[in-house]
Amino acid sequence: MIELFKEYLQQRRYRESTINGHLQNAGYFLKWVEANGLQEPENMQYNDLLNYVQYEQQRNLDVSTINLRISSISKYFEFLKEQGTVTRNPARTLRIKGKVKSVIQNPLKYDELLSLYNSYKAVEKDKSVDWWKLSRHIKERSQLAHQRNIIIVGLMIWQGLHSGELEKLEVNHINLNEGSIYIPSTARSNSRELKLSTQQILMLHTYINGGIREKLKPKADELLPGNVHNHVFFLTEELKGINPQIKNALHIRASVVLQWLRQHNKRQVQYMAGHKYITSTEMYEVQELETLTEQLSKHHPFG
């Protein structure tokens, strides 16, 4: 029956990623029906659906994710109606009320993220400081730290890395020939391999092979010597000076994930972001859908 449901969705010209989401959500529901020994869908009542919702709530799924699943279930019942299996859709008017928490307020746009990188890369040292009076060692350390921070900003903006992932990076995780980076797993995220941007490849080549990293006195094979959490904190404070909208490092990461959702399907974004659970990605997806709906309502208030 699921294969026929897939054909039904394809005939309605849904995107492949959307179809996969509906199939997955309908699958969750049907497994629950089977596990609980419930009646066939044609005999399902509204109260049965409420029991399913309660089950998902007990699993601590948020309101937005549950409503996404209800939407898929509703489409499944519309498919069954067309097949003549059911005469009504008990999920058609079912929606769970509750406050949907946005992942992030005022996310940065793609061009703002790129501008942030380019602006930081070109930033001049504070002109209020008389750099000529500082020792050569201090000036060199400052310049080296700036080069290291350019690498960090790039990894935050193009790969959406958080400090825990940055801390675990080693030189052998960078493949300059393939233009890729391997990101090890952490307690918060899965491992993955992502592409590097052209700008990153050039900077990483200089950083790794040009002696910059070695001068920062790394321990063993670590890519970013020193206390990475401190680096990210103070770097973020500098980035706020370039773009006051920035709240913290997670603000940047969330903006990147939302941008990915405009370009890739949900499963791809889950992999790229290292999310352990698809529900983490769905939280971003719901915010993006709500943003688009709000924009459409502004342009077409009576639509």
Which residues does each predicted region cover?
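Conserved catalytic core of the tyrosine transesterase superfamily
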Residues: M1-G303
